[in-house]
């Protein structure tokens, strides 16, 4: 009957729970409470596993393997980001620095924490995002695909700038940023300095696929948390995300 009612976690826990209940003379209401709690716990765990698989994480790294004292990101800033309040406010996060500074590890750990907090995550590289939007172009389902991506509470676009971005990549990036505007958080990691962020997209984008005002609104409309992971010799870089920051009210932490 429990199988028919689709209560697999009650069925799995029932023998042990009922044996304990008999030995300790539990009230029937307590037995029911414990069994239903096991079902809820099991379903929550299954949902988290499903969401982790759907997110498409690259490595599975979490804060369990993160050494906050080894990062150039201040511990207080790490703690603030780990509260995930910025995700609830649909704020955006940009972390930049050379390879090997832990950008992707930290953002992936944050993304796992987002799922642990009962939210959804979509993880892309710029290349995989471009491929996803490109496949949707074949059957004219771009709007549906972008809408599906934006059902996630956090959208991660990892390692922007590792390769030159062509027109298709730029269009895919801006479609998602525009659709997520003031609705979802977008986290970006990049191996280029913030002052060079505006060089990775084709200059023709503003006059082709999207109008310039729409791009400005997409990039400037929500608050942005900017964190730089550059070595000490490269601190003080001018022009923090010149093409993106604009009128943002931002938290700018220098590392």
Model-predicted regions and their roles:
Residues 16-20, 91-96, 195-198:
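Short hinge/gating elements
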Residues 3, 7-58:
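Interdomain "pre-motor" coupling segment immediately N-terminal to P-loop NTPase/helicase cores
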Residues 90-106:
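Walker A/P-loop nucleotide-binding motif
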């Amino acid at each position: 009957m429990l199988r028919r009612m689709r209560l697999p976690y009650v069925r799995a826990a029932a023998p042990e729970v009922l044996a304990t209940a008999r030995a300790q003379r539990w009230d029937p209401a307590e037995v029911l409470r414990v069994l239903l709690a096991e079902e809820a716990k099991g379903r929550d765990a299954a949902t988290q596993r499903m969401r982790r698989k759907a997110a498409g994480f690259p490595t599975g790294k979490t804060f369990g393997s993160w050494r906050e004292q080894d990062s150039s990101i201040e511990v207080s800033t790490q703690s603030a980001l780990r509260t995930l309040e910025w995700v609830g406010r649909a704020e955006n996060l940009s972390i930049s620095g050379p390879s090997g500074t832990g950008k992707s590890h930290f953002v992936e750990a944050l993304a796992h924490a987002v799922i642990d907090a009962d939210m959804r995550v979509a993880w892309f590289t710029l290349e995989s995002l471009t491929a996803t939007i490109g496949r949707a172009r074949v059957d004219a389902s771009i709007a549906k695909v972008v809408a599906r991506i934006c059902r996630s509470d956090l959208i991660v676009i990892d390692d922007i700038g590792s390769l030159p971005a062509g027109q298709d990549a730029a269009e895919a990036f801006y479609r998602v940023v525009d659709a997520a505007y003031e609705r979802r958080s977008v986290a970006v990691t990049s191996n280029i300095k913030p002052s060079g962020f505006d060089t990775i997209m084709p200059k023709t984008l503003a006059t082709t696929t999207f109008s310039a005002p729409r791009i400005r609104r997409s990039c400037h409309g929500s608050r942005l948390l900017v964190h730089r992971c550059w070595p000490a010799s490269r601190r003080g870089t001018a022009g923090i995300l010149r093409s993106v920051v604009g009128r943002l009210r931002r938290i700018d932490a220098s590392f």
